[in-house]
Amino acid sequence: MELARPAIAADRQACTRLLSQALVAAASMRGGTALVGDATPVTLLERWTHPGEAVHLAVGEYEGVVVGLLAVAATARAGGGQTGVVECCYVETAARGVGVGTALLEAAVEWSRAWGCTDMDALALPGDRTTKQRLEAAGFTARLLTLNRRLD
Protein backbone atom coordinates (compact mmCIF):
# COMPACT_ATOMS: atom_id res chain seq x y z
CA MET A 1 0.00 0.00 0.00
CA GLU A 2 1.23 3.51 -0.84
CA LEU A 3 1.32 6.28 1.72
CA ALA A 4 2.48 9.90 1.81
CA ARG A 5 3.46 11.42 5.14
CA PRO A 6 5.60 14.27 6.48
CA ALA A 7 9.30 13.44 6.47
CA ILE A 8 10.91 12.88 9.88
CA ALA A 9 14.54 12.86 11.01
CA ALA A 10 14.73 9.07 10.58
CA ASP A 11 14.00 9.55 6.85
CA ARG A 12 17.13 11.65 6.22
CA GLN A 13 19.20 8.81 4.74
CA ALA A 14 16.39 7.75 2.40
CA CYS A 15 15.77 11.38 1.39
CA THR A 16 19.47 11.89 0.67
CA ARG A 17 19.50 8.77 -1.52
CA LEU A 18 16.35 9.82 -3.37
CA LEU A 19 17.57 13.38 -3.90
CA SER A 20 20.87 12.08 -5.29
CA GLN A 21 18.90 10.02 -7.82
CA ALA A 22 16.57 12.93 -8.61
CA LEU A 23 19.43 15.37 -9.22
CA VAL A 24 21.24 12.95 -11.56
CA ALA A 25 18.00 12.25 -13.44
CA ALA A 26 17.13 15.94 -13.78
CA ALA A 27 20.65 16.94 -14.85
CA SER A 28 20.56 14.35 -17.65
CA MET A 29 17.46 15.96 -19.24
CA ARG A 30 17.33 18.92 -21.57
CA GLY A 31 17.36 22.05 -19.40
CA GLY A 32 18.16 20.01 -16.32
CA THR A 33 21.60 21.42 -15.56
CA ALA A 34 20.12 24.93 -15.36
CA LEU A 35 17.41 23.68 -13.01
CA VAL A 36 19.76 21.68 -10.79
CA GLY A 37 22.54 24.28 -10.69
CA ASP A 38 24.81 23.62 -7.71
CA ALA A 39 22.11 21.96 -5.59
CA THR A 40 23.08 18.96 -3.50
CA PRO A 41 20.96 16.66 -1.36
CA VAL A 42 22.42 18.35 1.73
CA THR A 43 21.58 21.91 0.63
CA LEU A 44 18.08 20.92 -0.46
CA LEU A 45 17.32 19.07 2.78
CA GLU A 46 18.59 22.05 4.79
CA ARG A 47 16.17 24.29 2.91
CA TRP A 48 13.21 21.94 3.19
CA THR A 49 13.44 20.85 6.83
CA HIS A 50 12.81 23.99 8.85
CA PRO A 51 9.72 23.44 11.02
CA GLY A 52 7.15 26.21 10.94
CA GLU A 53 8.40 27.72 7.69
CA ALA A 54 6.28 27.79 4.57
CA VAL A 55 7.90 24.65 3.20
CA HIS A 56 6.97 20.99 3.55
CA LEU A 57 8.90 17.80 2.83
CA ALA A 58 6.89 14.61 2.44
CA VAL A 59 7.99 11.06 1.78
CA GLY A 60 6.12 8.37 -0.08
CA GLU A 61 6.16 4.79 1.13
CA TYR A 62 5.31 1.55 -0.58
CA GLU A 63 5.02 -1.54 1.59
CA GLY A 64 6.70 0.35 4.44
CA VAL A 65 9.76 1.46 2.43
CA VAL A 66 10.45 5.12 1.57
CA VAL A 67 10.56 5.21 -2.24
CA GLY A 68 9.64 8.83 -3.04
CA LEU A 69 9.73 12.40 -1.82
CA LEU A 70 8.11 15.72 -2.54
CA ALA A 71 8.96 19.26 -1.44
CA VAL A 72 6.38 22.04 -1.66
CA ALA A 73 6.65 25.68 -0.61
CA ALA A 74 4.08 28.44 -0.20
CA THR A 75 5.25 31.50 -2.11
CA ALA A 76 3.74 34.98 -2.31
CA ARG A 77 2.21 36.03 -5.64
CA ALA A 78 2.82 39.51 -7.04
CA GLY A 79 -0.91 40.32 -6.98
CA GLY A 80 -1.38 38.99 -3.46
CA GLY A 81 -2.16 35.57 -2.11
CA GLN A 82 0.01 32.49 -2.10
CA THR A 83 0.84 29.74 -4.54
CA GLY A 84 1.98 26.26 -3.54
CA VAL A 85 5.08 25.43 -5.58
CA VAL A 86 6.18 21.82 -5.99
CA GLU A 87 9.96 22.18 -5.86
CA CYS A 88 10.72 18.48 -6.18
CA CYS A 89 8.73 15.32 -6.74
CA TYR A 90 10.65 12.10 -7.28
CA VAL A 91 9.80 8.41 -7.04
CA GLU A 92 12.35 5.64 -7.53
CA THR A 93 12.12 4.08 -10.97
CA ALA A 94 11.26 0.61 -9.62
CA ALA A 95 8.40 2.04 -7.51
CA ARG A 96 6.67 4.03 -10.25
CA GLY A 97 3.18 3.23 -11.40
CA VAL A 98 1.83 2.08 -8.02
CA GLY A 99 0.39 5.40 -6.79
CA VAL A 100 3.21 6.84 -4.67
CA GLY A 101 3.56 9.96 -6.84
CA THR A 102 -0.19 10.52 -6.78
CA ALA A 103 -0.25 10.18 -2.98
CA LEU A 104 2.62 12.68 -2.70
CA LEU A 105 0.90 15.21 -4.97
CA GLU A 106 -2.35 14.89 -3.01
CA ALA A 107 -0.43 15.49 0.23
CA ALA A 108 1.08 18.62 -1.36
CA VAL A 109 -2.38 19.86 -2.34
CA GLU A 110 -3.66 19.34 1.22
CA TRP A 111 -0.62 21.10 2.72
CA SER A 112 -0.94 24.02 0.27
CA ARG A 113 -4.62 24.49 1.12
CA ALA A 114 -3.80 24.46 4.84
CA TRP A 115 -1.24 27.25 4.23
CA GLY A 116 -3.87 29.35 2.43
CA CYS A 117 -2.62 28.81 -1.11
CA THR A 118 -5.21 29.33 -3.81
CA ASP A 119 -3.34 27.50 -6.59
CA MET A 120 -0.27 25.37 -7.25
CA ASP A 121 2.61 25.33 -9.71
CA ALA A 122 4.94 22.48 -10.66
CA LEU A 123 7.78 22.28 -13.18
CA ALA A 124 8.34 19.79 -15.98
CA LEU A 125 11.53 19.95 -18.02
CA PRO A 126 11.33 20.29 -21.83
CA GLY A 127 10.51 16.94 -23.38
CA ASP A 128 9.65 15.28 -20.04
CA ARG A 129 6.25 14.08 -21.17
CA THR A 130 5.91 11.56 -18.37
CA THR A 131 6.10 14.28 -15.71
CA LYS A 132 3.81 16.58 -17.70
CA GLN A 133 1.22 13.81 -18.11
CA ARG A 134 1.38 12.87 -14.40
CA LEU A 135 0.87 16.50 -13.39
CA GLU A 136 -2.02 16.92 -15.81
CA ALA A 137 -3.61 13.74 -14.45
CA ALA A 138 -3.36 15.35 -10.99
CA GLY A 139 -5.27 18.43 -12.21
CA PHE A 140 -2.39 20.73 -13.22
CA THR A 141 -2.61 22.59 -16.54
CA ALA A 142 0.23 24.03 -18.60
CA ARG A 143 0.08 27.81 -18.58
CA LEU A 144 3.58 29.06 -19.38
CA LEU A 145 6.64 27.94 -21.30
CA THR A 146 9.83 29.78 -20.40
CA LEU A 147 12.66 29.87 -22.93
CA ASN A 148 16.21 30.91 -22.07
CA ARG A 149 19.20 32.20 -24.04
CA ARG A 150 22.68 32.29 -22.48
CA LEU A 151 24.57 35.55 -23.03
CA ASP A 152 28.16 34.50 -22.43
Role assignments for model-derived ranges:
Residues 1-13, 17, 21, 30:
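Conserved N-terminal entry element of GNAT/NAT acetyltransferase domains
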Residues 20-46:
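Conserved GNAT-fold acetyl-CoA-binding loop/helix
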Residues 57-59, 65-74, 85, 90:
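Conserved beta-strand in the GNAT
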Residues 76-87, 96, 143:
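A conserved beta-turn-beta hairpin within the catalytic core of GNAT-like acetyltransferases
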Residues 93-96, 121-131, 148-150:
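Conserved beta-strand-loop-alpha-helix junction that forms the acyl-donor binding cleft
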Residues 95, 99-107:
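Conserved acetyl-CoA pyrophosphate-binding loop and the N-cap/start of the following alpha-helix
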Residues 102, 114, 126-144:
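Conserved active-site alpha-helix within GNAT-family acetyltransferase domains
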